[in-house]
Amino acid sequence: MSDTQDVNPATRRAAVGARRPFYRRRKSCPFSGPNAPKIDYKDVRLLSRFLSERGKIVPSRITAVSAKKQRELAQAIKRARFLALLPYILT
């Protein structure tokens, strides 16, 4: 017989749980730092990086933008939409 059938399932689970936990590196805000771009409603190319393919504003937990800069970014996107620089929805 094979040796794998003789192993206790509890010890197998313990061996699997003993692995090192997955470490996800914390992303930094793209608008923080010395060479960071300024958020401007006229910079359509920068603003469109933070819109989904449907035209919705991507949440900060995905883009790693800080809370303060996320509010500025949302305001700039809304201004650009109002001035017809960005679409409200993409079809």
UniProtKB/Swiss-Prot annotation:
Keywords assigned by UniProt? Ribonucleoprotein, Ribosomal protein, RNA-binding, rRNA-binding
Please list the GO biological process terms of this entry. translation
This protein's record includes keyword Zinc: no
Q: Which stretches are annotated as coiled coil?
A: none
InterPro entries for the chain: Ribosomal_bS18, Ribosomal_bS18_CS, Ribosomal_bS18_sf
Lineage top rank: taxon: Bacteria
As one GO molecular function, the record gives: structural constituent of ribosome
Any one annotated GO CC term: cytosolic small ribosomal subunit
Mention any Pfam family matching this sequence: Ribosomal_S18
The answer to whether keyword rRNA-binding applies is: yes
Which PROSITE patterns does the entry mention?
RIBOSOMAL_S18
The cross-references to PANTHER family, in alphabetical order and at most eight, read: 30S RIBOSOMAL PROTEIN S18, SMALL RIBOSOMAL SUBUNIT PROTEIN BS18M
* Oligomeric form and interacting partners: Part of the 30S ribosomal subunit. Forms a tight heterodimer with protein bS6.
Purpose of the protein: Binds as a heterodimer with protein bS6 to the central domain of the 16S rRNA, where it helps stabilize the platform of the 30S subunit.
Which family is it part of?
A: Belongs to the bacterial ribosomal protein bS18 family.
Q: What is this protein called?
A: Small ribosomal subunit protein bS18
